[in-house]
């Protein structure tokens, strides 16, 4: 719109045209106020009925809430107005009239259940606190990309339609691909490993992953955003260092650039970036800490994966971001390298928030014979992954990396109760639309 001024830029003494949504109308008799909202904030429009044209007043005060309008008028200081200024209108143009029966209240005065909000996401995003989540999400992704560039990474984009799953199993969405069986990719893992064997060496990707998991919990999605890193000539400890850098950079970017959004969420006083090195516990140390609390029905033993309850217990004990290292080889994927001095212990690691797992990573097996053996030990057919395995015959360097759940990072960063709040249009077992 030509000559439009954002509400945040409206300066006393100027004549401006502002445009946005009708947030609220308050009619006090001889005087009335319309609050107009755009992406930068809100501004008060004052109607003095006895001093204004009747048609102008009628247009401004009879419009439905959430209609899109433009207002042209003089900006004046008004300390009692929500933003300290107000517009005295010369003209009001109704651009798009809203239905009076709204499925939810964007002003937030009437709460709506999450399913209703997700069914009407466009309206839901008109609320300051919801919009703030996605503005913060955008800043997180910007900061993460910048952190990867500081690590001299090249951004890549890998296929999302594949012939075989990354890790086998049944957590795959099958599709028909020109008469062939194909799947939506559950991870860029194998492709990013191939890239570190190329001339690129150190890469990252931010993109969607698809997992046909049966889980239907506040922390699981069937389509999610994965933040992936892989580097040649890195071991698992260097990969953990990179992980710390990226996560801390995400927090620092939000702290520096999203104060208004944090205020909208009521987090301006408590939000802080994690400082220093994240504690690194071995898997065995983690089991000991969990078992020492006595909070589980049965003590954990070597080879057990950590349940949600176990993660919660350990998170309460540690109280900050931390790593779990040296996992049993038997419960880590085939591409994770074992320690040279103990083939029962892998170089795999998880990075945890006190409330849940955020990252899974490790050093990768770069030796062809050992890689094929790992396939066979986990009941997978190496020939089904020939495009991947054959490249390990042509000089594959030692390498390490990890994958970070983007929505989980946002969820834990902002203390959201449900991971679906961190996704514009979530995909889970019950939701395929909108």
UniProtKB/Swiss-Prot annotation:
Its main location: cytoplasm. It catalyses: tRNA(Asx) + L-aspartate + ATP = L-aspartyl-tRNA(Asx) + AMP + diphosphate. The record marks 82 as: Important for tRNA non-discrimination. One of its GO terms (molecular function) is aspartate-tRNA(Asn) ligase activity. L-aspartate binds at residues 167, 211, 360, 364. GO terms for cellular component: aminoacyl-tRNA synthetase multienzyme complex; cytosol. Pfam families: tRNA-synt_2, tRNA_anti-codon. ATP binds at residues 211-213, 219-221, 357, 405-408. Its EC number is 6.1.1.23. Gene3D superfamilies: Bira Bifunctional Protein, Domain 2, Nucleic acid-binding proteins. Keywords: Aminoacyl-tRNA synthetase, ATP-binding, Cytoplasm, Ligase, Magnesium, Metal-binding, Nucleotide-binding, Protein biosynthesis. The keyword Nuclease does not apply. Aspartyl-tRNA synthetase with relaxed tRNA specificity since it is able to aspartylate not only its cognate tRNA(Asp) but also tRNA(Asn). Reaction proceeds in two steps: L-aspartate is first activated by ATP to form Asp-AMP and then transferred to the acceptor end of tRNA(Asp/Asn). Belongs to the class-II aminoacyl-tRNA synthetase family. Type 2 subfamily. This is Aspartate--tRNA(Asp/Asn) ligase. The lineage of its organism: Archaea, Methanobacteriati, Methanobacteriota, Stenosarchaea group, Halobacteria. The gene is aspS.
């Amino acid at each position: 719109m030509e000559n439009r001024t954002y509400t945040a830029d409206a300066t006393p003494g100027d004549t401006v045209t502002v445009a946005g949504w009708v947030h609220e109308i308050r009619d006090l008799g001889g005087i009335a106020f319309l609050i107009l909202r755009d992406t930068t904030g809100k501004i008060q429009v004052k109607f003095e009925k006895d001093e204004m044209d009747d048609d102008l007043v009628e247009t401004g005060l009879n419009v439905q809430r959430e209609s899109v309008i433009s207002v042209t008028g003089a900006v004046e200081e008004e300390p009692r107005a929500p933003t300290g200024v107000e517009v005295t209108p010369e003209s009001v143009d109704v651009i798009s009239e809203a239905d009076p029966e709204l499925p939810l209240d964007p002003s937030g005065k009437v709460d709506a259940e999450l399913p209703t909000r997700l069914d009407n996401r466009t309206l839901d995003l008109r609320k300051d606190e919801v919009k703030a989540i996605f503005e913060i999400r955008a800043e997180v992704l910007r900061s993460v990309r910048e952190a990867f560039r500081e690590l001299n990474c090249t951004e890549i984009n890998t296929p999302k339609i594949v012939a075989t799953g990354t890790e086998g199993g049944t957590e795959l969405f099958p599709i028909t691909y020109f008469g062939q069986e194909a799947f939506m990719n559950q991870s860029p893992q194998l492709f990013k490993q191939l890239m570190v064997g190329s001339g690129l060496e150190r890469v990252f990707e931010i993109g969607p992953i698809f997992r046909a998991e049966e889980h239907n919990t506040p922390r699981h999605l069937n389509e999610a955003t994965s933040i992936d890193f892989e580097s040649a000539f890195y071991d698992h400890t260097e990969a953990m260092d990179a992980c710390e850098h990226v996560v801390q950079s995400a927090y620092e970017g939000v702290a520096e650039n999203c104060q208004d959004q944090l205020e909208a969420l009521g987090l301006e006083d408590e939000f802080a970036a994690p400082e220093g090195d994240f504690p690194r516990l071995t898997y065995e140390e983690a089991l000991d800490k969990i078992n020492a609390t006595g909070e589980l029905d049965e003590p954990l033993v070597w080879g057990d994966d950590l349940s949600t309850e176990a993660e919660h217990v350990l998170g309460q004990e540690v109280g900050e971001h931390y790593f779990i290292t040296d996992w049993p080889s038997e419960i880590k994927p085939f591409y994770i390298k074992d320690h040279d001095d103990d083939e029962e212990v892998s170089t795999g690691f998880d990075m945890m928030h006190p409330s849940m797992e955020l990252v899974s990573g490790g050093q990768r097996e770069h030796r062809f014979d050992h890689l094929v053996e790992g396939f066979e030990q986990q009941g997978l057919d190496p020939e089904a992954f020939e495009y991947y395995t054959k490249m390990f015959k042509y000089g594959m360097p030692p390498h390490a990396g990890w994958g970070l759940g983007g929505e989980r990072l946002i969820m834990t960063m902002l203390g959201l109760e449900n991971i679906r709040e961190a996704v514009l249009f979530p995909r889970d077992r019950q939701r395929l639309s909108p």
